[in-house]
Design a protein with these regions (language model features):
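Sec-dependent N-terminal signal peptides
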Residues: 4-13
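Intrinsically disordered, low-complexity boundary segments flanking structured domains
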Residues: 9-10, 51-55, 181-182, 191-193
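Active-site-adjacent loops and short helices of periplasmic peptidoglycan-processing enzymes
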Residues: 16-167
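Penicillin-recognizing serine hydrolase domain
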Residues: 19-20, 116-237, 241
């Protein structure tokens, strides 16, 4: 069954070369296959799944807005954003930009928009990791640009399963593209996962990530059960394919 699942997901070549991976059956709560599932390493933008959970659980203002400022710039990797700076943007639109397009500036802006400082937000991320039993996980920023954001495939299974409780995360995970409303403009962005972008597969949870120190990362939970099972695939690979 596993080979059938992976072939449907178009991920057999990726798993074959992955440094660490786990295929987990949420329906029956068991590991189907894995390699070095407890290996700890940077997780890049997969971090944003925790950012989304912490923001949704702590933000008390349904109409909150935030502006991207100099404090949100990427001084680590030098990435850019399509969103306008110094312009009030709905937090819901920032969340969309972060989960669909993996916008780092949006992740930074959200981390100071839930009624706490950025440092307090990061502390909440680490507290949530401990609460979920993610013993190998540490966060130092909300975007994943820092290589100090570390975890393991086994820990990320717990985060993926927990994220299934958030309707907004599930809805945004499966958007091939989106328009972000920002300062009177509609900014078009595409999903960072080709499987979702080209509508090859429906995702319940989907987050990609890449920095040089981590390689290519993916957390993917299929939306429609395969052989009556909900499959969670997490991998880290030196190449995107």
């Amino acid at each position: 069954m596993l080979k059938k699942v992976l072939s449907v997901l178009c991920l057999v070549p990726v798993v074959a070369t992955a440094q660490s991976y786990i295929v987990y059956d949420f329906t029956h709560d068991r590991v189907l296959e894995s390699s070095s599932p407890n290996h700890v390493q940077p997780i890049a933008s997969v971090t944003k799944l925790m950012t989304a959970n912490v923001f949704l659980e702590n933000n008390r203002n349904a109409n909150c807005t935030a502006s991207i400022t100099d404090d949100d710039f990427d001084y680590i990797k030098g990435t850019h954003t399509k969103l306008p700076k110094y312009t009030p943007i709905s937090c819901n639109e920032l969340l969309k930009a972060m989960l669909v397009h993996s916008d780092n500036y949006a992740a930074h802006a959200l981390s100071r928009s839930a009624g706490m400082s950025r440092l307090q937000f990061i502390q909440k991320m680490n507290e949530k990791a401990r609460e979920l039993g993610m013993r190998s996980t540490r966060f130092s920023d909300s975007s994943g640009l820092s290589d100090s954001n570390i975890s393991s495939a086994m820990d990320l299974v717990k985060l993926a399963k927990y994220s299934l409780n958030k309707a907004q995360i599930k809805n945004l995970s499966n958007m091939p593209s989106a328009f972000i409303q920002a300062g009177g403009r509609s900014v078009f962005v595409k999903n960072t996962n080709k499987l979702v972008r080209e509508e090859v597969f429906d995702a319940a949870i989907n987050k990609t990530g890449y920095i040089r120190e981590s390689g290519y990362n993916l957390v993917f939970v299929n939306k429609n059960p395969c052989n009556h099972s909900t499959i969670c695939l997490l991998y880290t690979s030196p190449s995107p394919r």
